[in-house]
Amino acid sequence: MFHFLKFQKKNDSQVRVYVSYYSQFWDGQWEPYYTDSKGNLNFDGNNFEDWSLGNIRLNLQQIKNRSSSFKKKVAVHEFGHSLSLAHNMDDVSVMKPGELSFNEPQKADKTHLKNRWK
């Protein structure tokens, strides 16, 4: 099952990608933020109203010795979050967390994206 995050306008979104060494034990991370009515940036993970801005962080500390296919999977997974796809437990989805062999969106992912952005 997919869960979606609400974007106000498609053309308001901005995603930045950072590839660096982080001491944490995650491969990749989607870090959404939003601007409030005063223009202040907020990183409150409990606010699901507008995550049209965000950073993707790829952790070289964890993935530097992994295959290029695995690195691509992590990047595609995090980009899925930037398109408002959440984790799901579908075995045939790039959005399933953990070790998977998929490094590109699968049929279910594409269907959910089409439904989300029509």
PLM regions: where:
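Metzincin-family zinc-dependent endopeptidase catalytic domain
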Residues: M1-V76, S82, A86
